[in-house]
């Protein structure tokens, strides 16, 4: 109880990391306390750590009737991890007025509007990408991020990958490489992250290193089709390069 109160006090003073530690200490004594889990999720949300916050919300409602407060918080976390469809589903008991106070139902309508707006921006980003309008696709992704005040660093992994590809297509190789390295450092065994690096190497005309990266991805996931196709492309480029070099040398010897 002392740790819980300390966590509440720290949260009120905007010391969110310390509040997380206090709630974690309290949860070691009451691991199934929905109140503590929701309190810690609020602290995680304040830190922009929506994945951890969502995990706490899911534990808080597991095996019990969820409160309106819990569903609202969960829906916001789902938006924070880029899952507007899930947020809309979570909000449905509040929107149908089957659960929650009138104030919670009003908040649910606001979050519902945010979820639908996020859906629209993501759909727009995909549509512009198919049209190869990389600038407008980037703007749409910016707008999707803005709903939950996300940055490229705090965005969901799938959005980070979208951003890297958009930066590549727009010729911003330095920014693309920086974000791709952040993704890779988070999980060096992730084949998607490895292939992002390979694409950047190819864009930098380092075909040999790009080929090696695709081979690494295939060692980790032999069935990865994207890596297989990319490897074939790199081999074809190296063959063209070798043929061009051979032709150049032959021409020089003829002279």
Please name every model-derived segment.
Residues 1-255:
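Alpha-helical tetratricopeptide repeat
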């Amino acid at each position: 109880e002392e740790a819980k109160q300390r966590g509440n006090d720290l949260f009120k003073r905007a010391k969110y990391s310390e509040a997380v530690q206090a709630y974690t200490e309290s949860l070691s004594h009451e691991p199934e306390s929905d109140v503590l889990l929701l309190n810690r999720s609020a602290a995680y949300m304040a830190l922009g750590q929506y994945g951890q916050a969502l995990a706490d919300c899911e534990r808080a409602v597991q095996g019990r009737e969820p409160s309106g407060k819990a569903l609202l918080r969960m829906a916001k976390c789902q938006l924070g991890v880029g899952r507007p469809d899930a947020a809309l589903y979570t909000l449905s008991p509040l929107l149908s007025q089957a659960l929650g106070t009138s104030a919670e139902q009003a908040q649910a309508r606001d979050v519902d509007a945010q979820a639908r707006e996020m859906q629209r921006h993501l759909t727009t980003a995909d549509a512009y990408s198919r049209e190869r309008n990389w600038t407008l696709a980037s703007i749409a992704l910016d707008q999707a991020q803005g709903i939950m005040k996300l940055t490229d660093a705090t965005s969901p992994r799938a959005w980070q990958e979208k951003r890297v590809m958009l930066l590549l297509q727009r010729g911003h190789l330095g920014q693309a490489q920086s974000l791709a390295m952040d993704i890779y450092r988070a999980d060096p065994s992730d084949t998607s992250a490895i292939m992002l690096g390979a694409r950047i190497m190819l864009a930098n005309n380092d075909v040999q290193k790009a080929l090696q990266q695709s081979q690494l991805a295939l060692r980790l996931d032999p069935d990865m089709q994207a890596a297989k196709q990319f490897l074939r492309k790199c081999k074809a480029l190296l063959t063209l390069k070798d043929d061009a070099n051979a032709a150049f040398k032959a021409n020089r010897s003829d002279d």
